[in-house]
């Protein structure tokens, strides 16, 4: 029997994915999904495998209507259902996009269309799809500043970069929006507001599927690879599954095939990629429980926190680590400190007379028992520091949840991120304790 295809593996996957037959509540009867299915059917989409449902933990997703086998098609969405830059250029916006200089980016074209169609309300041909899109998102760019301040430092920095990027995107697009005034009775400033563009940006950023790059003269040279895929984008992420997803040029459909088995009435998942929880939070606004790719990042400042300040070779050691790419992506994971983190610590812990052995350290060679033990001791101190910091943040979040009810959803999300990181740190502490016993 092939690995991962037996009964035990399926049971394990069900536990990890958190789905069961009794837990999903079918939502096919809801008016928004009835309208969406009519809309999709008119665009040649036929599907009997999946049904919209609400699941605890993951929220709205898609439930299997029948047993699904390995290699079976989960969903095949015709090109006529996809929202791409072709859709936008064929629309009333096409003439304005074509004549605007410099050419708008593919992302701006998609975002402009989403805002315009949402503003159109019941007059929009895309209304059934727009109705099921989230009204708000939980990416860091959408969070209140006081909530962003609670994020791990590395994620907070990326969140602030993300916010600056979206703000610049809005500022640089305002002249283009002004050119669209002839299309609207209302002032375009009230339609294409920052909040409206932020919603559209998050919609594309969190829900788009990847298409082969295309190039159009009327659009900028940025990669034109995004498409919104109605209904298909209800599939939630699990790091424990694998699928094959791509646009089929022969059938002109975006297709997803499963490499797993699904029982009837289980939630069907896809995998957005082997992302850690900080990446999932940043890009999609959620945290994955039991994520095997989850980790805790160690910054340069923390890396040297417990090293002797009297080490005259420290600057040189840091320079070597930087030159060889060992100053970034140093982590604690479910299995303990990463090889990269331990390697960096071993080099930093080299005694003066052993410093010339630094190349051997980077190659994974053992220099001495003393060096091995010292690096493990430092790793343990860093791990305990993180555990203490994480507990302090979780306590702060708990107090804020009591005091600021309006932010409870945002705070709960941040709390889940820190809770997962605490689990990882505790697992790493146990691993380090086991490794240290070899030197006692």
UniProtKB/Swiss-Prot annotation:
A GO molecular-function annotation: histone H3K4 methyltransferase activity
Ranges for domain SET: 48-273
Localisation: Cytoplasm, Cytosol; Nucleus
GO CC, alphabetical: cytosol; nucleus
Residues annotated to bind S-adenosyl-L-methionine: 272
Biological processes per GO annotation: chromatin remodeling; inflammatory response; methylation; positive regulation of inflammatory response; positive regulation of interleukin-6 production; positive regulation of transcription by RNA polymerase II; positive regulation of tumor necrosis factor production; regulation of cell proliferation in bone marrow
UniProt cross-references to Pfam families, sorted A to Z: Rubis-subs-bind (PF09273), SET (PF00856)
CDD domains: SET_SETD4
Signal peptide region: none
Role this protein plays: Protein-lysine N-methyltransferase that methylates both histones and non-histone proteins. Via its catalytic activity, regulates many processes, including cell proliferation, cell differentiation, inflammatory response and apoptosis. Regulates the inflammatory response by mediating mono- and dimethylation of 'Lys-4' of histone H3 (H3K4me1 and H3K4me2, respectively), leading to activate the transcription of pro-inflammatory cytokines IL6 and TNF-alpha. Through the catalysis of TBK1 monomethylation, may regulate virus-induced interferon signaling.
Subunit structure: Forms a ternary complex with TBK1 and ZNF268; the interaction with TBK1 is ZNF268-dependent and leads to TBK1 monomethylation.
Protein name: SET domain-containing protein 4
Organism of provenance: Homo sapiens
UniProt gene name: SETD4
